[in-house]
């Protein structure tokens, strides 16, 4: 089934009005994307809190209409519905159903991280390399955005876990994923040989997503999820926290206390330029602190002092 697609730019403040107008004139679907994606101004949208729908400052809004819709009449109807909005920057084009589906799926291709780790959407066949006997494959819903491996902070943490496995530091260990989101990091650790993973997040939605992904990957028996206030007090040989720099600063003492003596920690969700203060913040507890960069994002790793 073909469609007529209207694409335009808007701000977070005007997005509800644009979307309301589009739906009123018969849009079949409306998709929101970061207008600054793949640029230095790209914004990370982390797992939302309950009842929250965080958006980017500037968005690309794409609406699909039936193929026989008249673009000029649609534009006139939109201008009549909300004449205060600027509709002049919108552009129309005809798209085939298979083109739309392919464009969506192309955003979520199988991805490899390091020597063994693969993140593969459910709708894709396993690449040949991911079928190797020692491949660590995590299957995720392609509808996931942040926490699907596509963001540099997630990729930095996945590569770190992969290297721990290569170095023999992950097998049979317990792993804490603090700020687990979709559970992608904890699941990767399990697939790489960890014995057990604990996922902690302050968002109940994230815990549901993590538990669901664990079950779909056959890891429900080894994955346990908790709200922060319910997390058992324990230490772990491996701790990973992919959250915001401000949270990493505020939680430094707590996270340090969760790492066993000689254990490893990885911190991400850190923009380039923020790593200096965090390196100093964690220095009282960790040796061999290192910062690794991927584009505009950083990862800090260290070894817990005995």
Curated annotation (Swiss-Prot):
Domain of life: Bacteria
Subcellular location: Cytoplasm
Keyword Methyltransferase on entry: yes
Keywords, sorted A to Z: Cytoplasm, Methyltransferase, S-adenosyl-L-methionine, Transferase
Residues reported in the UniProt entry to bind S-adenosyl-L-methionine: 154, 179, 201, 242
Top EC class of this enzyme: transferase
InterPro entries associated with the record: Ribosomal_L11_MeTrfase_PrmA (IPR050078), Ribosomal_PrmA_MeTrfase (IPR004498), SAM-dependent_MTases_sf (IPR029063)
Chief place of localization: cytoplasm
Presence of the UniProt keyword Thylakoid in the record: no
GO biological process, one term: methylation
HAMAP family the UniProt entry points to: Methyltr_PrmA (MF_00735)
NCBIfam families reported in the protein's UniProt record: prmA
Function: Methylates ribosomal protein L11.
Protein name listed in UniProt: Ribosomal protein L11 methyltransferase
Phylogenetic classification of the source organism: Bacteria, Pseudomonadati, Pseudomonadota, Gammaproteobacteria, Lysobacterales
């Amino acid at each position: 089934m073909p469609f007529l697609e209207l694409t335009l730019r808007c701000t977070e403040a005007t997005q509800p009005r644009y979307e309301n107008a589009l739906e009123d004139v018969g849009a079949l679907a409306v998709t929101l994307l970061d207008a600054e994606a793949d640029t230095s101004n790209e914004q990370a949208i982390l797992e939302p809190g309950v009842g929250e729908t965080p958006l980017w400052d500037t968005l690309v809004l794409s609406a699909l209409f039936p193929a026989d819709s008249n673009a000029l009449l649609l534009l006139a109807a939109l201008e009549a519905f909300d004449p205060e909005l600027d509709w002049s920057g919108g552009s129309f084009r005809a798209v085939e159903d298979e083109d739309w589906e392919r464009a969506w799926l192309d955003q979520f291709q199988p991805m490899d991280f390091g020597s063994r780790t693969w993140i593969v959407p459910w709708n894709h066949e396993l690449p040949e390399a991911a079928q190797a006997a020692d491949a660590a494959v995590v299957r995720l819903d392609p509808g996931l955005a942040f926490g699907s491996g596509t963001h540099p902070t997630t990729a930095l943490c996945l590569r770190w876990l992969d290297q721990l496995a290569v170095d023999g530091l992950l097998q049979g260990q317990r792993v804490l994923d603090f700020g687990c989101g979709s559970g992608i990091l904890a699941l990767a650790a399990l697939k790489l040989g960890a014995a057990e993973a604990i996922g902690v997040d302050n968002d109940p939605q994230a815990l549901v997503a993590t538990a669901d992904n664990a079950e779909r990957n056959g890891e429900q028996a080894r994955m346990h999820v908790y709200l922060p206030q319910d997390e058992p007090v324990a230490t772990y040989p491996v701790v990973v926290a992919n959250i915001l720099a401000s949270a990493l600063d505020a939680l430094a003492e707590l996270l340090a206390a969760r790492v066993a003596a000689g254990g490893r920690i990885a911190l991400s969700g850190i923009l380039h330029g923020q790593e200096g203060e965090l390196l100093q913040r964690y220095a009282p507890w960790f040796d061999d602190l290192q910062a690794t960069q991927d584009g505009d994002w950083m990862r800090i790793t260290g070894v817990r002092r005995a």
